[in-house]
């Protein structure tokens, strides 16, 4: 992946809903990022999103000039995509001005961190979703692809926009729907300027190893032993109970 290293970030507007504390002890109950604007010279491309507590609420498809809501429940709301298009146009103008005035120093490429896990506990043959979390992304230019047994997978794949972090880096999540099988393994392939070569994060379903014949024999023997002990103990208690009843009858009334 040959990528141009010229990059410029747009303004990041954050609105924070704070808990009613004061001074240095203020802790955020919820954090909303309204109008996360990103424009870069690579591509060139831009991004406009709204986020709440780290989740993407919607983004504006700049090519189709429409708002895309990430959850069906949010589609009752409206957002004029023209607002985002205007913001991106302003960022593009500012970027061009800054490039002319700068010495074109490249941004520092951070090394992304990749984690792969399943959405729910894995049962072979039952639908599930693999999640590839790519964290610490900067600059926000990355390729994320899925491989199954070494072959590229395109069906059932979706991903988020670049989601902002407080340290001004980004993270991105890619999803893969699948039917887990003992014959298939998966890799999340990540390409980024901060990596010397593409990074592959491997995942395969964990299948409990079958018990050996010796283990099965030991388990059966232990179960049989416990059962026999229970029978013997129960018999002893029954005999003692019968003897106690017989003794009380022979004593008769005082």
Curated annotation (Swiss-Prot):
| Disulfide bonds, paired cysteine numbers | 132-188
Write out the topological domains of type Cytoplasmic: 240-254
User: Impact of changing residue 76 to R on the protein?
Assistant: In allele DQA1*02:01, allele DQA1*03:01, allele DQA1*03:02 and allele DQA1*03:03
Effect annotated for changing residue 182 to D: In allele DQA1*03:02 and allele DQA1*03:03
Q: What is the effect of changing residue 221 to T?
A: In allele DQA1*01:04
Question: Which portions of the sequence form the region Alpha-1?
Answer: 24-119
| Impact after mutating residue 88 to M | In allele DQA1*01:01, allele DQA1*01:02, allele DQA1*01:03, allele DQA1*01:04, allele DQA1*01:05, allele DQA1*01:06 and allele DQA1*01:07
Give the family per the record: Belongs to the MHC class II family.
Give the multimer and partner information. Answer: Heterodimer of an alpha and a beta subunit; also referred as MHC class II molecule. In the endoplasmic reticulum (ER) it forms a heterononamer; 3 MHC class II molecules bind to a CD74 homotrimer (also known as invariant chain or HLA class II histocompatibility antigen gamma chain). In the endosomal/lysosomal system; CD74 undergoes sequential degradation by various proteases; leaving a small fragment termed CLIP on each MHC class II molecule. MHC class II molecule interacts with HLA_DM, and HLA_DO in B-cells, in order to release CLIP and facilitate the binding of antigenic peptides.
The protein in question is named HLA class II histocompatibility antigen, DQ alpha 1 chain
The organism of origin for this protein: Homo sapiens (Human)
